[in-house]
Amino acid sequence: MMTAARTAPKGKGIDIIETAIVTGEEIQQLSDTLKAMFEEFGMKFFLRDADNILQAECILLIGTREQAQGLNCGHCGYATCSGRSEGVPCALNSIDVGIAIGSACATAADLRVDT
């Protein structure tokens, strides 16, 4: 699944995808973090997921580094990449991570790996 995410198509062919595996005691730490996020933000899915992940042998995390792709496409809401406010993600980064997750999920389905 990590390989599928890593090799998925990317905007401009630039790989800024990050993957990691969480195992062992780190799963409990992640669960504790999700519970703290529930306390801070009040969103119940954090609490649900905090309990659900304790059943897993491992957890695959997929994300992206934030890096403007220099296309000045405007999909982020700004006319140019240089005009983008700090903290506003490049839309291509979001698209890339979505494609990477889709590729990883397709591999999971092929292997009959469920949630």
What are these regions (language model features)?
Residues 1-115:
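Acidic, surface-exposed loops and disordered segments
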